[in-house]
Structure formats: structure tokens, C-alpha cells
């Protein structure tokens, strides 16, 4: 078990060995800061190639083969599924854009969730900051992830749109500062297609999801959301996308919702204005943690003005 941000928090990032872990601050040197409101780390071509070699299909799926929970019909469309954590089987842009993240940190392999954002030709992934760094800076050097890989639409070991490697990590300075906290736990990653997809239409990359930023860091755009991710602890396997839906509460730059999804869901998007039959909506937050004393509620960081500035920087420098 790694050190927590606070004694009450459990981050929803999972080790491939299927243990619940939380990000720990690393001791080795890492990123650098530039400009106002951005901490970043570039990833070279050699490191990107190493990630492709490292994450074989076998490594991606090892120790994660379990029977998934039963699916559901469209009856849930008329009500909340809070706490259910159902498998998403209805397609749409969300099924293609949301994906699984694989990375190494401190010699251990981990998994998270994330989503392509930014329109028809996306080259930016939204995830949690602790899915690219070792944790809040607490005044020490930040360790950045190695072997970082994003697989959009990952399902049962298939890579329908191929693999994306990280070109640059961007997080809020609030996350790496000594006072960094959960409200700053969001990151944007500039990505590069690394391997082709599998199956019909695989050459065409999936469109990125739309992002809607709150007018202030402490407010969410709407009171109802759908949350997506790749939970990996039982009864889940991490081999398919799952979701929860329901009303949310917002306070202090964070949102909460009853949801039974487990470790591995960190970095998954929260979508407001979601249309289940179309699989479309606006991303307003990103999954960050659960309270150790109340694992029935999932929490996320609201994407406010600081996230908007980071996102715009990521788009400009990626294009």
C-alpha cells in the first residue's frame, strides 16, 4: 500500500497485480514548470518506443481475466444507475474516446482511465494528475510516469483504434506544489498514435469528447452526470468500460456521486448533458478518489478556469 494524500483518501488507480493503491510521491527528479499555470514533462521518441515494446497484449491483460458482471438493457435510460457500475455496451463517441491507461511508476505497473478530448482529430487525453505523476509535490521533486500508454476503446484485450504514447504531460502547478490537493488532480497529455487499430475502420481515429469548463473551480456545470472508466478490482476486470449515472453534489472544486466502480477508474470522465442513446455529452470533471470510510461514493475534480488554461495550452502546443 502506497502513501495517501491524506489518511482518509483512497485513489482509484490500480496496480496490475489488482491491489488498491494510491499514488506516492517519488524521490527521483522529474518535471519542470514553464509559463503561468502549467507544470509539464516532455517524453522523447526513445521513451515512446519503449512504451510500445513494454505493453504487449499479454502484459495488458495479465491477471485481469475474470467474469464481468451482467450487462443491462436500456431500461436504465429512464432512471439513475448510481452505485451500479454497469458495463457500457451501447457504443457512441464515448465508447471510442474513453480508454484505458497503462503506465509504470517507481518500478510498479499501474492502470488508470482517460478520454480523448478536442474534436475531430484529437491528440490530447484528459486523465487524473496522479495517473501521470507520483502525487502532490509536497515541496519535493515530482516523479513522472514511464511506459505511459493510452488505448481508446479498449475492450476484452482488443485495441480497436490502436495505441497512443505520451508526448508531453501537463498538470496544474497546484498539484505539484507543497499544498497540492485533490481539486488539482487533473492532467492533459499530448499523445501520438503509436500502433494501428484492429478491425474495420480502424485507420480512422475516434473523435475527442467535448469539454465544458465550470465558471469557477467550485461549481459543476450540471447536477447530473454519467461517469465512465475501467474499474479493475472485483467484481470488475478492467477489460471493458463501465459507467455510473446519477445526481452529483459539488463542493470545493470537487463532485461526488454514489458509484460502485473500483480501482482503475481514476482519470475517467464525468459527462454532463449526456445522451445515452447517442453516447454524447460534455466532460465537466475527472475521477480522482474515494474516501476510505465510504467506498460507495466516487469523487472527481471539477474542470474549472485553471483546467481550461491548461487545456488550451495543451491544444496549442500539440498543434
Feature map (PLM): residue ranges:
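Protease-domain processing segments flanking chymotrypsin-fold serine proteases, especially trypsin-like
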Residues: 2-3, 10, 22-119
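Catalytic nucleophile loop of clan PA
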Residues: 260-286
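C-terminal cap/linker of serine protease catalytic domains
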Residues: 284-319
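Conserved catalytic-core segment of clan PA serine endopeptidases
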Residues: 84-109, 117-118, 139-198
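Loop/turn elements at helix/coil->beta-strand transitions in domains of secreted/extracellular proteins
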Residues: 96, 121-123, 221-224, 252-253, ...
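Terminal peptide-recognition signature
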Residues: 56, 101, 114, 123, ...
